[in-house]
Structure formats: C-alpha cells, structure tokens
Amino acid sequence: MKSVGINGYGTIGKRVADAVSAQDDMKIVGVTKRSPDFEARMAVEKGYDLYISAPERENSFEEAGIKVTGTAEELFEKLDIVVDCTPEGIGAKNKEGTYEKMGLKATFQGGEKHDQIGLSFNSFSNYKDVIGKDYARVVSCNTTGLCRTLNPINDLCGIKKVRAVMVRRGADPSQVKKGPINAIVPNPPTVPSHHGPDVQTVMYDLNITTMALLVPTTLMHQHNLMVELESSVSIDDIKDKLNETPRVLLLKAKEGLGSTAEFMEYAKELGRSRNDLFEIGVWEESLNIVDGELYYMQAIHQESDVVPENVDAIRAMLEMEDNPSKSIEKTNKAMGIL
C-alpha cells in the first residue's frame, strides 16, 4: 500500500484524493490547504488529515475550528509520492524548492510547463516512458481529451494530420471572478494554440494543429476534430474501436444527449459524485469520413477527466504496474468508470 499525499485540495486535488482512496494499492496520508475555507472543513469531515502549506496561517484554521494535523513539509516526509494540484506555476516552484531537496516523487497538473517538469504523461500514450520516473506532468484536460480519442484512431488506421478547434468553457462552475459573460474570445488569438504542442509531449510524432476560443459556459469543453487518415476504414470500424476504448463514450444526440448540458445530466444519472464525467463523450452522429478525412465532435468535463490519469501516473512512477492496460482497468474498476 503506497502512501500518497495531495498538495492543493481544490478542484482537481479533492477528486484525486477520492480516486486514490478508492484504490486497493494506495492510500491518502493527508491533503494540504492554504486557507480555512469550506473545502478544508469538508476534507477533515471526510476523514482526511489536513496539513497547512502556509504555517503562518495556523491561527486562522484554529479560529475557524478546523483541525490541522501539521505542516505540508511534515506530510511530505510520510509519502512515497505527492500529487501536486496547486495553481498554475506553483507546482514547478514546489518541484525545485521542496520535492527535489526532499527526494520526493511528484506528479503535476497540466497548468505546469512541460519543459519545467521534464516529462509529461497520458495513460494511453506514453505510460511506459514514465515507469520509475521521479517527476511527471499529467497533461491538461483538453490534451487528455484529445489523446483519449486520437490514440485508438491512430492504432486502428494511422493518422496523417489532425486539425482541431477547441471551444473552451470560460470558467469552472465555482469560479465567479472569471469569464467571459457575454462574448466569444479567441484564446489565444494566434494560431496554432498551445494544445497541439501539448499533445506532442505524449504523442511524440503526431502532426497536429489546434486553435481555441473561450465561450460563456462553465460545464464542459467541446472539440471539433478533422483527422486525415493513413489507411482506409469505415465509420463502423471507427465506432467499434471507440466503443472498445476505456474512458471514451459514444453518446447519441437523438437520445437526448445533444449538448454539454445533457452530458452533465447523464453524469448525474450515472450517480457520479460531483456529477463527474471522467469519460470523453463523443457525439456518435458527428462521426463521418469524407475523402479519407475523419470528422467528429467531443466534449470534455474539465474538472474530472484527468483524475484517473493521475492514479495511473502514480502506479507508473512507483513501479506498481508496468502494463498500462492493467493499470487503466484497475483504476476504472475502482472508480466505476465506463
């Protein structure tokens, strides 16, 4: 049973904590928070030992009546690996300032720069390259979504080139200080966007160009993909391949699943905690091949799709499982992923 800690119990951190707790080969030793907010209180209520990453704020936790077990550094000393879920840019500083000095393995989130961490990870793309490594960055929610569907297509028939238009949510549901509220924003206004190069950190030889925009919604990201195929296949071949791929769902608009809002309603009907949809939802009706080019649309629940990949990264880095398919299957079974 490997000992895991979560540095940053927020949107991703709290989900990874629950995912790790569901496994039978790893456990959560503790989680960290900087502020005595409702998430800190609920972490303690759920039974997680809470450590503070800002020791000077200990009094504020005491005043709020939130039990603190110790400091983040004290937590790190007890761990085999830490999952860093701190805000963008903080993880790289933690790597250099704390983890390397302590000799502590760490996974990071997609907000960190690949070059600063040195290695990126996706369960389906480069699991074996991360086995035994000290530091790895789980690629972003958008990149994870692209890899989930492009990998099986590449395995089936090969890919010449990918072009993708990313329609990104403006903010997470709880983020009241972000937007846009009444605009469509090219983000970035330059082409290509960073998503293509991010995919190439795990699918090394893929020819991919992306562009992205922000829209006033909070529920999910949406992708529109155009994929030039190397060999001839039918739509049924593509459907069969995606249907057999873990963490991918073919969903039908004609069954009332024609929007991201309805995808989220589907997650509720699955009985998921926090309404999470770990799987990438592909609109089955969007699949089409024209002159050797595959077209399809998919949606990504940005708060949760990277969570199972964090669990797989732990197994790879701690050399708990060298077969990616076995780790994926084990993670999925424990988390109830389809």
From Swiss-Prot:
GO cellular component terms listed in the entry, alphabetical order: cytoplasm
Catalytic residues in the record: 141
Any GO BP: glycolytic process
Gene Ontology MF, one: glyceraldehyde-3-phosphate dehydrogenase (NADP+) (phosphorylating) activity
Reactions catalysed: D-glyceraldehyde 3-phosphate + phosphate + NADP(+) = (2R)-3-phospho-glyceroyl phosphate + NADPH + H(+); D-glyceraldehyde 3-phosphate + phosphate + NAD(+) = (2R)-3-phospho-glyceroyl phosphate + NADH + H(+)
Gene3D superfamilies for this protein: Dihydrodipicolinate Reductase, domain 2 (3.30.360.10), NAD(P)-binding Rossmann-like Domain (3.40.50.720)
Chief site of localization: cytoplasm
Annotated binding of NAD(+), by residue: 11-12, 111, 169, 302
Annotated localization: Cytoplasm
SUPFAM superfamilies: Glyceraldehyde-3-phosphate dehydrogenase-like, C-terminal domain (SSF55347), NAD(P)-binding Rossmann-fold domains (SSF51735)
Matches recorded under InterPro entries: DapB_N, GlycerAld/Erythrose_P_DH, GlycerAld_3-P_DH_AS, GlycerAld_3-P_DH_cat, GlycerAld_3-P_DH_NAD(P)-bd, Glyceraldehyde-3-P_DH_2_arc, NAD(P)-bd_dom_sf
EC number: 1.2.1.59
Top-tier EC class: oxidoreductase
Pathway terms, separated by semicolons: Carbohydrate degradation; glycolysis; pyruvate from D-glyceraldehyde 3-phosphate: step 1/5
Domain of life where this protein originates: Archaea
List of residues binding D-glyceraldehyde 3-phosphate: 140-142, 195-196
Family: Belongs to the glyceraldehyde-3-phosphate dehydrogenase family.
Name assigned to this protein: Glyceraldehyde-3-phosphate dehydrogenase
Gene it is expressed from: gap
